[in-house]
Regions:
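Conserved glycine(s) of the Walker
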Residues: 46
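P-loop (Walker A) phosphate-binding loop of NTP-binding proteins
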Residues: 42
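ATP-dependent small-molecule kinase phosphotransfer cores
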Residues: 64-122, 163
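Short glycine-rich anion-binding loops that position phosphate/pyrophosphate groups of nucleotides
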Residues: 112-115, 136-138, 177
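A glycine- and Lys/Arg-enriched "phosphate-lid" helix/loop adjacent to the NTP-binding pocket
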Residues: 126-163, 167-170
Length: 190
């Protein structure tokens, strides 16, 4: 809307007509720069690695939701689960996602279970495009991941699959080279 207003003002001031294609190009560019890139997926699907590579490629700040949760709680994710339980962790996670979802132009790597809380969807989607990373179950590491260590991965994936699909705007395979995944996401943003 502001871009259209600027177009009209410029046309009135300069007496030059600006084509709709130019307006659309500017809107896409502004939207591309301001919208957050949100990464979701199973624990170990490569969200952190993809976020770091995307941040470098696009010159954007990378935010790790789990790091912010750990800082807020003053303990590691496994410690939060062991001492306070999953419910406490999920509350902290939703608080962090609410704060980060309001920001602009960041790359946010989420925890694998953020999709289990329906209230997280509007927090992530309000200013972001949600990319779901998929990876072959055999390639998913479980070390340091509390739920992945106590639950069968195939069962966990089956339970979360419909939730990931519901949240995702775009699904990207992360079974190949990191550069290919990054390029696929960059192309989807255009």
């Amino acid at each position: 809307m502001l871009v259209a207003q600027a177009k009209r003002s410029s046309e009135q001031f300069t007496g030059t007509v600006i084509g709709d294609e130019a307006l659309e190009r500017v809107e896409r560019t502004v939207n591309h720069r301001l919208r957050n890139i949100i990464l979701i997926g199973m624990p170990g699907s490569g969200k952190s690695a993809v976020a770091a590579a995307l941040g470098k490629a696009l010159g954007r700040e990378v935010v790790e939701a789990d790091e912010l949760i750990s800082q807020r709680a003053g303990m590691s994710i496994p410690e939060i689960f062991a001492r306070s339980g999953e419910e406490t962790f999920r509350k902290l996670e939703t608080e962090v996602l609410a704060e980060q979802g309001k920001r602009s132009g960041i790359i946010l790597s989420t925890g694998g279970g953020c999709v289990t809380q329906a209230e997280n969807y509007p927090l992530l989607h309000q200013n972001g495009t949600i990319f779901r990373l998929t990876r072959d179950l055999a390639k998913l590491p479980t070390e340091g991941r509390p739920i992945s260590q106590t639950t069968d991965l195939a069962q966990l994936c089956a339970r979360r699959e419909p939730l990931y699909r519901r949240f995702a705007d775009v699904t990207v395979s992360n079974d190949g080279a990191l550069e290919v995944t990054v390029q696929t996401i960059k192309e989807a943003l255009l």
